[in-house]
Regions:
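Short, solvent-exposed loop/turn segments at conserved positions within beta-propeller repeat blades
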Residues: 2-8, 51-54
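Blade-edge beta-strand/turn elements of extracellular beta-propeller
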Residues: 18-26
């Protein structure tokens, strides 16, 4: 699935025209990271999906677009976690370009909370809306932190010009 902003949405492409179409892959506001899409008889799709809030499970999208979750492998572990809020932010970066980020924070914190600014490496990569076993914003927020992660200039998922914009200038246009 192609990257689009912070997500890797479920998509389909017309083999003749090359025109791509995003397909809803989740009952949540954002699709997260969709992969392993396999066509099913009758026009449905089987796929894996994870997000910044939840590890990978299997889903099916029927021919009419109805999404159903088939597995909930980590339900017992996830039930032990406190709820966190997830949101996106957008602001004007260098050259007035749109720059995107995500924020995760404990729900209704009783006091001011410290903030962890989580930055992806690369620099041409992305810290998308996906579950990570290496550096996990959801698990950092679980410890009482607000988490901010920005896809600065050079990040992937925003077009080649945006990704290439920091070539030979890593610190100048972030």
């Amino acid at each position: 699935t192609p990257q689009d902003v912070r997500d890797h949405p479920l998509s389909r492409a017309d083999a003749v025209t090359g025109k791509a179409e995003k397909l809803k892959a989740s009952t949540e506001p954002f699709d997260g990271n969709v992969g392993d899409a396999t066509p099913l008889p009758g026009g449905g799709l089987l796929y894996s999906r994870n997000s910044a809030l939840a590890p990978t499970d299997l889903f099916v999208r029927d021919a009419k677009g109805k999404v159903s979750q088939l597995t909930n492998v980590h339900a017992a572990q996830m039930a032990q976690f406190d709820q966190v809020e997830f949101d996106r932010l957008q602001f004007a970066g260098a050259n007035g370009d749109k720059v995107w980020g995500i924020i995760l924070k404990p729900v209704n914190p009783a006091q001011k909370i410290p903030v962890a600014f989580v930055v992806h490496g690369g620099p041409q990569g992305s810290f998308g809306n996906s579950w990570s076993t290496r550096w996990n914003p959801r698990l950092i927020a679980q410890q009482g932190y607000g988490v901010v992660s920005i896809d600065f200039h050079g990040s992937s998922g925003y077009g080649q010009a945006f990704t290439h914009s920091i070539n030979k200038d890593w610190g100048g246009r972030a």
